[in-house]
């Protein structure tokens, strides 16, 4: 092999190692990848209109259709960019996955936004989680009360995202099966 061939091979290998694949594969796009996500601007606009009218929005679609990517790279950046003009651009997004303990997981997701929560000793964090979980379970307005307490004194909008919402149905079936046994 000549020196020229080696040089070309080294150049090609170095070029390949610097290539960046803009597609995340099967995982959803993250907020930091918004610049790679495009083509659903019309859907983002429609979602913002529906959210501003009803304060609730369900994003439905088949598994793998891009619901999470749409949320993280379409809707959330639009909200933070002030596209829902009456609400402003000051938003915090609390993301929770139901898993096997939906209320407890939601409480944990909410507490991430409580000032100084992470500085508390483990025992005090557990007490806080128990209190928030109890308030969430206490009434249909439990979530509203918890968010008011977390945001006390702040002028901030809160978007609560329940990602993988369908897990709630699996959880309720599992809970029903366990109570039958």
Model-identified regions with their sequence ranges:
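Amphipathic helix/helix-loop-helix segment enriched in hydrophobic residues with interspersed Lys/Arg
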Residues: 1-181
